[in-house]
Amino acid sequence: MKISCFLLMIFFLSCFQINPVAVLDTIKCLQGNNNCHIQKCPWFLLQVSTCYKGKGRCCQKRRWFARSHVYHV
């Protein structure tokens, strides 16, 4: 019984290893000071890429005014 529990534990641990390559899109998003959302980005954020192995969305703050609309004094 102990051996079968041990083998079962080894099997589960080998199945649920974290893949460091699978989260590269999430790391890239967070390094750009963006946010990762599972569902659609809120209206005040723009989607710029993906997160969580393509299952989420990388959202960035919108630019409310373009530089061409700013009046210089």
Swiss-Prot record:
Family: Belongs to the beta-defensin family.
A single BP term in Gene Ontology: defense response to bacterium
Range of residues in the leader sequence: 1-23
Location in or out of the cell: Secreted
Tissue: Only expressed in epididymis (corpus, cauda and caput).
Name of the protein in question: Beta-defensin 40
This protein's UniProt keywords: Antibiotic, Antimicrobial, Defensin, Disulfide bond, Secreted, Signal
Phylogenetic lineage: Eukaryota, Metazoa, Chordata, Craniata, Vertebrata
Function according to Swiss-Prot or TrEMBL: Has antibacterial activity.
Domain of life: Eukaryota
Disulfide bonds: 29-58, 36-51, 41-59
Gene: Defb40
InterPro entries, per the entry: Defensin_beta-like (IPR001855)
Any Gene Ontology CC annotation: extracellular region
Major subcellular site: secreted
